[in-house]
Regions:
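Short alpha-helix adjacent to the SAM-binding motif of class I
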Residues: 136-147, 151
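SAM-dependent methyltransferase catalytic region
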Residues: 152-157
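Core catalytic lobe of class I
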Residues: 1-131, 135-138
Length: 157
C-alpha cells in the first residue's frame, strides 16, 4: 500500500482578507506518500552541502533549498488565469515530483482538479495517473493536457 510520510504546507500569496474572520487560512496542506522504497534525488539529499553554499534570492539554488522543507512558497495563479476554482500552479507540484521521482517514474494524483499535477509530471518526463470524478473537471484536464502536448489524452476506466 501507500504510506503517508508527511504533510507539506503551501503558503499562498494574494489572499483576500475578510474583516469578520480573526485568522485567515493562507495555506493548503499536501499529503506526501510513498509505495515501496522511496527515491530521493541525490542532489536534494546532500542537505548540509547545499546549505553551506551561497544561498541568495534570484538563483536556482535558493529555490532548491526551499524545496527541501515541508513549507512551500509558491505564487498562486492570478484569478484571470484560473479555469478551476482551486487551481494550483504546476510549479507547486514540480517541487515534490523533482525531489521524489526520477524521469520515467509514475505519479499518482487522486484529486485531479485542473490537471496541474499531470502538467508538472509531463514537463518533468514522468507518467501521471490521475483520478477526477467530476466530468466537467475531467474535460478541463484533458483540454489542458492536449493543448500542452499536442497529443490525444488516454483515458483509463
Amino acid at each position: 500500500g501507500i504510506q503517508n510520510k508527511r504533510v507539506c504546507i503551501w503558503l499562498k500569496n494574494n489572499q483576500m482578507s475578510t474583516p469578520q474572520i480573526a485568522f485567515h487560512k493562507v495555506f493548503e496542506p499536501c499529503i506526501y506518500g510513498i509505495r515501496g522504497d522511496p527515491f530521493l534525488s541525490k542532489y536534494h539529499t546532500a542537505f548540509n552541502e547545499v546549505m553551506n553554499k551561497e544561498v541568495g534570492t534570484g538563483n536556482r539554488l535558493h529555490g532548491d533549498v526551499l524545496d527541501m522543507f515541508s513549507v512551500w512558497l509558491e505564487k498562486r495563479l492570478p484569478a484571470s488565469e484560473m479555469e478551476h476554482p482551486t487551481q494550483k500552479p504546476p510549479t507547486l507540484y514540480e517541487k515534490a515530483i523533482r525531489r521524489c521521482t526520477k524521469p520515467g517514474d509514475s505519479v499518482l494524483e487522486l484529486f485531479g482538479g485542473s490537471g496541474s499535477t499531470l502538467i508538472a509530471a509531463e514537463q518533468l518526463k514522468r507518467t501521471c495517473y490521475l483520478v477526477e470524478l467530476d466530468p466537467l473537471f475531467s474535460s478541463l484536464i484533458i483540454k489542458r493536457y492536449e493543448k500542452l502536448t499536442g497529443q490525444k489524452a488516454t483515458k483509463l476506466s
